[in-house]
């Protein structure tokens, strides 16, 4: 995990941190720390730094909105059940902020591909124009890959498959070297898929192009319903977002929806999440969405400085700024 300057304490030591009271704001109190070496105070960035509402409130609003509630319904729920007054703009900003942060982390994870990968694009209406959401799904684990929201172009098709290649290409090469059965991609008759796969996955994966709905009549054991059945949930989510005009916000909502489905939603009580089925085992706790945000940041300043000390601290050299 990389550490930005905005999260850096004032020194790299591990013995110069002390508790220094509490920081109070609207959401309550938060532990404040002091660097005894430079006599400066700070609070750790746990993913909700300088936010006026509690982490549980923010995550509950995001979960409600992603499960199909409108902005107004989410706002009314928080007021009726928790006596918390929040504007619709705040909820919208939370979704955009944490969608981008979580996606930047989950894009670095590589799910194990155990069966076919089905690709398709679902038609949406944004700002009165036809728009398409490109996505893919693994048939056995149910893990989803989210592509761009845009036109039906070759570039958007390549963007989706570039993400799949980044996460799964090493598995394809390993299967080829060991002589195992290749991963198979399944998609409809859109020529963009065949052209893209011939460039990106040549000789390392098989394709089934132009899969029909009546697959058994064509001698096939499967069709593309694995991904097409997911389009209903996407259409229902967009239908709640009336008169939406911001394509970037639509993309954030749909990407965050797929991330929550991958890491926080079980198919039933006894089954695993798609990410766990794909070999990505993260200790997210009971509130998995909140746990996913905490994974992006350091929960405790001592843990942060210790990890920083182990990775970046060089005993023999001295910083020029503080020499």
Report each predicted region and the residues it spans.
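RNase H-like polynucleotidyl transferase catalytic core
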Residues: 204-225
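Short cysteine-rich clusters marking metal-coordination/redox-active sites
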Residues: 8-12, 35-38
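Acidic/histidine-rich, metal-coordinating catalytic segments
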Residues: 174-193
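C-terminal domain-tail junction helix/linker
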Residues: 251-323
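Basic, short loop/linker segments at the boundary and entry of helix-turn-helix/winged-helix-like folds
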Residues: 20-66, 112
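DNA-recognition alpha helix
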Residues: 72-84
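Charged alpha-helix within mobile-element recombinases
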Residues: 223-269
